Amino acid sequence: MKTQFIELTGKTLLDVVNEGEIDFKQLHDAGVVGDSILRINPHGEIELRCKSNWMLVGGLIGSFEERLTELTGLDWAE
């Protein structure tokens, strides 16, 4: 089975997370900005879309799944 993801922008990611669920400095240092394209898998791993690949830039902890699907309007997809 392939890994599933939900794609979102950096701005939407900020709307999804609660304080303490993510290391914002780590994301900033990796180059994540408001219009960055990101994807998150069900394990909470966050990847940043680069020119020719996806780069792992951090991870979420906590109960983010329901907020993620509600705020993006998306379901998990391969």
Regions found by a protein language model. Give the residues of each.
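Mixed-charge, Lys/Arg-enriched low-complexity segments
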Residues: 2-13, 53-78
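Acidic, low-complexity, intrinsically disordered interaction modules
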Residues: 18-69
